[in-house]
């Protein structure tokens, strides 16, 4: 299976931004952030970076605001690594998939505990 160029660029962006965040940005709004995924458009002009953060809703919003305000610096650092004619614009978005997955797990557990073990009688 062939990989699109945008997939390779997304992988490079993912590792580079993870490295930048591990070194730390000088913004107190940014909490403990984990990059969960990167989507790059086929024309390589926009990169959506999905992240999660430990904390409440206020921590999520402040981290997203901090990351988006640091996007210009991060884009500059990406330009050094990517060595492309045009470095993609960056947009940080909170990744709700973990919360969604947790909700599904909770519902499955709830259904499982609602079962009183009388399955053998129904057969």
UniProtKB/Swiss-Prot annotation:
Keywords, sorted A to Z: Cytoplasm, Ribosome biogenesis
Stored SUPFAM superfamilies: Ribosome-binding factor A, RbfA
Subcellular location: Cytoplasm
One GO MF term: ribosomal small subunit binding
GO biological process: maturation of SSU-rRNA
A Pfam family hit: RBFA
Protein task: One of several proteins that assist in the late maturation steps of the functional core of the 30S ribosomal subunit. Associates with free 30S ribosomal subunits (but not with 30S subunits that are part of 70S ribosomes or polysomes). Required for efficient processing of 16S rRNA. May interact with the 5'-terminal helix region of 16S rRNA.
HAMAP family given in the database record: RbfA
Subunit structure: Monomer. Binds 30S ribosomal subunits, but not 50S ribosomal subunits or 70S ribosomes.
Protein name: Ribosome-binding factor A
Species this protein is from: Trichlorobacter lovleyi (strain ATCC BAA-1151 / DSM 17278 / SZ) (Geobacter lovleyi)
